[in-house]
Amino acid sequence: MKTSPRRPLILKRRRLPLPVQNAPSETSEEEPKRSPAQQESNQAEASKEVAESNSCKFPAGIKIINHPTMPNTQVVAIPNNANIHSIITALTAKGKESGSSGPNKFILISCGGAPTQPPGLRPQTQTSYDAKRTEVTLETLGPKPAARDVNLPRPPGALCEQKRETCADGEAAGCTINNSLSNIQWLRKMSSDGLGSRSIKQEMEEKENCHLEQRQVKVEEPSRPSASWQNSVSERPPYSYMAMIQFAINSTERKRMTLKDIYTWIEDHFPYFKHIAKPGWKNSIRHNLSLHDMFVRETSANGKVSFWTIHPSANRYLTLDQVFKPLDPGSPQLPEHLESQQKRPNPELRRNMTIKTELPLGARRKMKPLLPRVSSYLVPIQFPVNQSLVLQPSVKVPLPLAASLMSSELARHSKRVRIAPKVLLAEEGIAPLSSAGPGKEEKLLFGEGFSPLLPVQTIKEEEIQPGEEMPHLARPIKVESPPLEEWPSPAPSFKEESSHSWEDSSQSPTPRPKKSYSGLRSPTRCVSEMLVIQHRERRERSRSRRKQHLLPPCVDEPELLFSEGPSTSRWAAELPFPADSSDPASQLSYSQEVGGPFKTPIKETLPISSTPSKSVLPRTPESWRLTPPAKVGGLDFSPVQTSQGASDPLPDPLGLMDLSTTPLQSAPPLESPQRLLSSEPLDLISVPFGNSSPSDIDVPKPGSPEPQVSGLAANRSLTEGLVLDTMNDSLSKILLDISFPGLDEDPLGPDNINWSQFIPELQ
């Protein structure tokens, strides 16, 4: 702690006379330098003073000489056995007799065979006796000032005791004064100005020292228990101000004390507050006295003095001796030892406690960021969706309600990524959701003639787990269907084909240059494909949900036309690109409204490639133009009512047949898988014209039972596709990216299928 700025000055003032200890030796060195004339004059003056001293009834052996430099000042040499009080009385009387003209200052020095007092201090004091001041300056060589002897009547035994405590260096310096007056010539080195100013200052200091010594004499005995505090002045006592005030008040007999006495008691018992503490500790004492109710202020009878007492109900009569009382009564331990033991470790304990309390707090501050990591609910895990909740809407709940249920289920299980439920359309003939705009449609792989088999396939789809892929028997394919006049657009179909080929090459473990869609599989092949799909679906589930690929905004996505046949590019190149009669943005917004409330991009659009990965087989476009659109059996299966002017100039590249015809009649003979692949555009692209509107599903026209059956299957597959898409945020990508290894090398290819077993059912 910082020391008080004024305290070192007080200490210096007390030690100020100490450097004068070498004064006798210095004077002895200077004595030979004195001129003989000065010595003779001093001797003459001294002889006069001796005569005066005899007349003033001075005791024998006292020599008085005038000061060589200071006017009206005399030096009095006192023997060891002289009575100081009688000498002072005689000097006072002499000063009164001489008045202002005579000497009124006397410097007393001790003389004899041995130094009466150690060298060091030359304090001077001045005392007033009358209207005329007679200053008696007593100069000694001991640490005890002569002013104390003037102001405090002490017995000669005390003075002798002080004289016996002199240091031996005075003797070595030869400070013994002979009877010859020449031995006091060392006083010449003092100038009158310096000696006068020093005498005035030292007189004031000696008064202060006198009062301090009187106070120390009074409190010398009670301060004995706290003697050990002298060894630890730099350490603050381990007591509060309130406790120290109680110690001070309870130390008195009447249990009351003035504020000044409280200050004094604390300074005496705890030197820290006297030497080191800042002066503000007294303000703290006053603050505690007025703050605590246990301290009561009382006034004396005359109302001039106020005392502080402790309220009887709150007084525990704590004293400093009780605090330092030994714990073991059998061990007589001094209070000061206990005091030092109790005082010294406490600051260390306090520091240790602060360290112990601060370190856990710092550790807790560091651990705060780690706390959320421990919480298990923040770890991304795969939430298993209840199968009943997923499958029930596909069978019992209407489509809008199913969409709302799935969106709420998705929002509840995956809060980070929200993907709008999209309608997945299986490879069956269905009707669009509404006739107002193009929706997501389904396609027949081999024409409407296979519609009697579709209910069985739909049942198989419902048996599949909701998070799994559907097998090739009824693979759902998302297709954004444009209006009728936009259907033969060459560029979107080219993009669709290239995008699918990019998916196949990037996602499938084995590259497959061909895609063969066969709606009929043997039971063993269906089971094996289901196992493969389940295995891939589990592997996709095991991936982190954070691995999501950002898609471009939906505005930038082109309209997709479904055509995966290898001859589509050549077929589309021969067709003129018609004017687009519908806004792609409206179609996208419509598809988002159908899917759900979230505006998310369509996920089946992928980066396109300018080079198709499938070989284009030579095929004449004339085989596709078999019948014009006017021959479609009188049934309007167009999802959008378009103007006739937009649909008239379109040629018929799709080979639309009557509904009563079968794919075997319209398609060329299947000699090889290549021929089957090249005939895919016939089967797949003819589906949009075979899709019926909701009115056609509810009230089918006579002579066309197939659209009704396919429409029922489409309703079921629509909801099924919704369930599959809302299961996981990555399933919609799996539906397009899933690969089918072993498809090309299957011995049971499309050309090995016996189509005759299906002919009776189709008829």
From Swiss-Prot:
This is Forkhead box protein M1. Phosphorylated in M (mitotic) phase. Phosphorylation by the checkpoint kinase CHEK2 in response to DNA damage increases the FOXM1 protein stability probably stimulating the transcription of genes involved in DNA repair. Phosphorylated by CDK1 in late S and G2 phases, creating docking sites for the POLO box domains of PLK1. Subsequently, PLK1 binds and phosphorylates FOXM1, leading to activation of transcriptional activity and subsequent enhanced expression of key mitotic regulators. Phosphorylated by GSK3B leading to ubiquitination and proteasomal degradation. SUPFAM superfamilies: Winged helix' DNA-binding domain. It comes from Homo sapiens (Human). InterPro entries: FH_FOXM1 (IPR047516), Fork_head_dom (IPR001766), FOXM1 (IPR042839), TF_fork_head_CS_1 (IPR018122), TF_fork_head_CS_2 (IPR030456), WH-like_DNA-bd_sf (IPR036388), WH_DNA-bd_sf (IPR036390). Expressed in thymus, testis, small intestine, colon followed by ovary. Appears to be expressed only in adult organs containing proliferating/cycling cells or in response to growth factors. Also expressed in epithelial cell lines derived from tumors. Not expressed in resting cells. Isoform 2 is highly expressed in testis. The gene is FOXM1. Interacts with PINT87aa which is encoded by the circular form of the long non-coding RNA LINC-PINT; the interaction inhibits FOXM1-mediated transcription of PHB2. It is found in: Nucleus. Transcription factor regulating the expression of cell cycle genes essential for DNA replication and mitosis. Plays a role in the control of cell proliferation. Also plays a role in DNA break repair, participating in the DNA damage checkpoint response. Promotes transcription of PHB2.
